[in-house]
Structure formats: C-alpha cells, structure tokens
Design a protein with these regions (language model features):
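Alpha-helical recognition segments enriched in aromatics with Gly/Pro capping
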Residues: 1-32, 47, 107, 127-341
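The substrate-binding groove and active-site-proximal loops of carbohydrate-active enzymes
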Residues: 87-93, 119-124, 212, 240
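Anion (oxyanion) recognition and catalysis
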Residues: 54, 138, 466
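N-terminal, positively charged nucleic-acid-binding surface of large information/translation enzymes
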Residues: 8, 17-113, 477-481
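Structural preference for alpha-helix termini/caps and helix-kink/transition segments
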Residues: 279-281, 287-484
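Short, well-structured beta-strand/strand-turn elements
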Residues: 59-61, 141-147, 383, 471-473
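Short, glycine/charge-rich beta-strand/loop segments that flank catalytic centers
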Residues: 63-69, 98-105, 115-130, 148-157
Length: 484
C-alpha cells in the first residue's frame, strides 16, 4: 500500500511503526457551527482510509479531537475564540453550543456512513496534558512568556516549514480582515501555546496554570490528545488542506521539540471542495450542510459517492448539476444491484479474486477511490453468477460504505410490492450502465405488448433486439439488457 505523504511530497510504502497496530489521528471539528459539506469531504476520505486499513488486515486505533476551546477566528493566534463567537451569535453558553454542534456533526457523519473514531476527545478534557507539554517546552527553551501568553519560539527550530510546497491559494492562510496581529511575538511564525486572561477578558472557559488563569491554544490540543491516547509516536495524521499550515506545521514543531524525536510518519491532506465563487467557507458565510442537501431531495450517500468519484488530492468542484449527476448515478447503481437475483449458487472464488485484485490495486495506490468505484462497476459487468456479484459488492462496500446491498434489497422489495398492487413503473436497466433511448423504447414496447397479451409482437421485439446483439432478462417490473 502506498500513501502520498505531504511531508515528503511523494508516495511512500505504508509501513506502520508497530506490527500489531496502526495509530491514526484525525483533526476533528470546531463545534461552533454546523459542518459544511466541504469539511465532510475530509472526513469521508479519512473514513475510507480507516476502513481500507481494516479491510487490508490492520488493527487500527483512530483518535479524533473535538475543538471546544482555543480555535481563534484567524486559524492562527489572532481574533476571537470561535466557540465564544458561536455562543454570542445564538445567545447560548459555550458548552450548550459545543454539545449541540457536536451532536449535529455526528448526526451528519451517520447519514454519510462515516464511522465514529475509536476515541473522540473534547479539547476541554485534556488541560493537564497541555500544561505538561508546555511546561517542558518552557524548561527546554522552546517556549517563552510575553504579554500574558506563552508562545512557541520557532527560531529554535532548524526547519519550521514542513509543507511549504503547497500554494498559498491552497493553504488560504494569512491574517483575516478585521483581525489584529499579535505584537508580543518574537518571530512572525511564533504561536500561542497558552493564553491568559490578559488576552481576552470575556473568554468563557478558563483554567489555572503555572502562567496564570487562561486557556490552551488550538495547536497544542491535538498534540496533547494524540499523545494521551496514542503515545509518543503516530503512524498517520489526517486533515483538510487548510490544516497543513499553520495548524499541522505547529503540531510538528511543538510535538517533536517536546519528544526529541520524529512524531508522525505520514501526513495526508484532502483538498478543497470548491464552488463557482471559490472555496466553501464558514467564515465567508458560504456553506452547504447535509441537512440542506436532504431538504432538496438528495440522498447524503449520493454526496459520498460524488466525493469518492474524485481523488482526495484533487480539488472537487461542487455544483447542483454535478450533484444531480451523482444522485442519478447512485440511483442507477442501486437499480442495477436490485436487478441481480440471488439464487443460492456457489460463489465463484476465481471471479472474486479477479475482481478484488482491481479494487485493492486502486486503493493501494494512494486511496484511488475513483478507480475503486470503477472496479465496483466491473463487478456488475463480469461474466459470473449473481450470487458471486452480490458477495463481491457487499465486500467492496465494507470500504466504500454506500449501503449498496441494503438499498438494493429495499428497492427489490419496493418493486415486488408495486407489482402486487399494480402501481409500478416499468424500469429499464443496462448492465453496463450505458443509456440508449432506442433500446429502452423497444423494451417498453415489448412490455406493453406482453401486457396486452400480444406475445407474438413481444417475441418479435425480442428477436429484433437479439439481432442487434442485445440480450434481455426480465426482472420484476422491468427488464435489464446487455450487449453480447
């Protein structure tokens, strides 16, 4: 298995630190607002990664934080705590805001079939861990106290910019409009490890510390939570491209200065979901939620499929037209699987091996989900019995998590119910997924002839299709066809 490592800027063979476990850390949401579908693209990719590692036989422990304090509006050290901003917006307490939007986040994840990580830790639970790390950084000269805050001194590092090949447009960093720069820093890139009350008098959440009553910076939270649950080394750290700088850069700086050795081996970043006006962003007030997609009639799993059809290291352009296409593709996929007829036949193990080789080759190549979806379509076209196809589809869906078998079973039951009531519409399914209006018209004409008991005409149409190299199979309330 090869993964693209953002730190080395190349694909590398994946070799975990320990043979018995893969340690995986995911930057979780800042729970001051709903997650937008661009945020959720990252969590979909991370979900696929975890599930594929398990599929490949690894034992995985995945940890994710919930940021409920310390994440400022600049994404660096300037501005207001986002949690306080959310509380003011909705006239609620910070903890009320945190609980509501944490619950909303996991509700969205459930709709998208995103597995809950093994450990989910709110940042406010780990204050002692942050103080322990900061104290050692102060003692070893990597941190200093100024203006009421504790800062990490980036001038002490031989190398600070780890991900500096990213374009500025990709990273979207810099001081945002209306945000004042911190004049207490010795160096431009220094960052806050601990804020005291001297910074924000109205900060809602504060704790005692050796440096005064205050609260942790955003970056120290992920280091502390990761070390608490995963120890002093880490295999994979994931996040959106926005996290690469300054957040992940600062995590590496403080963690490796504290530990005295390399902290994480593989860094993986998901690129933006863009709209016609640019990157989807809560700070700009331009974002779409899973609930909004549902209100417009879309299945959240159609959005998951939309994400899987593109590689995670490519920017993905969202439009309603593109989502319409994904929903149509998803519906057709479910219909094609529903047209398969389980008959209790033996599974063809040779076919399984051939089909799985394409699927695993795709995902072994830096999680190429686009080719993995193509491998799924190959199953439907493969010359083997339907029981084998259904078994392989169920196997692939352990990773893709599109609820393919469940949705197909429901569709099959719906068609049978419609057949009994006589309210069903005739469904035409192409086994290859292609669309041909002429063939569909002939199949519907044949169905009408059969309904009128004009079997001679129905047979004539079947013969006409056969002469065109089309094989027809009748299914409940429809027909499926393929070229032979």
């Amino acid at each position: 298995m090869k993964l693209y490592n953002s730190a080395s800027r190349k694909k590398e063979d994946f070799v975990p630190n320990h043979p018995d476990i893969v340690k995986m850390y995911t930057c979780g949401p800042t729970v001051y607002h709903f997650a937008h579908i661009g945020n959720l693209r990252s969590y979909i990719m991370e979900d696929v990664l975890e599930k594929y590692l398990r599929y490949a036989g690894y034992n995985v422990k995945r940890v994710m934080n919930i940021t409920d304090v310390g994440h400022l509006t600049s994404d660096a050290d300037e501005g207001e705590d986002k949690m306080l901003k959310g509380a003011k917006r909705e006239h609620k307490s910070v903890m009320e805001i945190a609980k509501f939007y944490t619950d909303a986040f996991f509700s969205d994840c459930k709709k998208l079939n995103i597995k809950t990580p093994d450990v989910v830790e709110p940042a406010t639970n780990c204050i002692d861990e942050y103080i322990k790390i900061i104290t050692k950084l102060m003692d070893t000269g990597y941190a200093y106290f100024a203006g009421g805050n504790v800062y990490f001194d980036t001038s002490k590092l031989e190398r600070y910019y780890i991900f500096n090949d990213f374009n500025a447009d990709d990273l979207d960093v810099g001081v945002r409009e209306g945000v004042e720069e911190d004049v207490n820093k010795r160096n431009k890139n220094d960052f806050v490890l601990w804020f005291t009350k001297s910074k924000f008098e109205d900060q809602a959440l504060k704790w005692d510390s050796p440096w005064g009553v205050g609260y942790p910076g955003w970056h120290i939270e992920c280091s502390g939570i990761s070390m608490k649950h995963l120890g002093e080394d880490l295999d994979i750290h994931c996040g959106g491209i926005d996290n690469a700088f300054p957040h992940h850069t600062n995590e590496i700086a403080q963690s490796e200065s504290y530990l005295g050795h390399k902290w994480c081996n593989y860094w993986m970043h998901v690129l933006h979901l863009n709209t016609n006006s640019g990157k989807m962003s809560k700070s700009k007030g331009e974002f779409l939620t899973v609930s909004l997609l549902e209100d417009k009639g879309y299945d959240p799993l159609a959005y998951r499929l939309f994400c899987l059809q593109s590689h995670y290291r490519k920017s993905l352009v969202f439009s309603w037209e593109n989502l319409d296409n994904a929903q149509g593709t998803y519906n057709k996929l479910i219909n094609r699987i529903a047209a398969l007829k389980p008959a209790g036949e033996a599974v063809d193990e040779d076919a399984v091996a051939a089909l799985k080789s394409k699927f695993t080759a795709a995902l072994d190549n830096d999680l190429n989900t686009s080719l993995a979806v193509t491998a799924l379509y190959d199953v439907l076209k493969y010359d083997t019995n339907d029981d084998t196809k259904l078994a392989v589809i169920a196997d692939f869906d352990r990773v893709l998590s599109l609820s393919l078998i469940e949705k197909a079973d429901a569709r099959r039951a719906e068609l049978k119910k419609q057949a009994v009531s006589g309210t069903s519409e005739f469904t035409v399914i192409s086994e290859s997924g292609e669309s041909d209006a002429g063939i569909e018209a002939l199949l519907k004409a044949r169905a009408n002839a059969k309904k009128a008991k004009n079997f001679a005409e129905a047979d004539r149409i079947r013969d006409e299709l056969k002469a065109q190299g089309i094989e027809v199979t009748d299914i409940p309330n429809g027909a499926k066809w393929k070229r032979i």
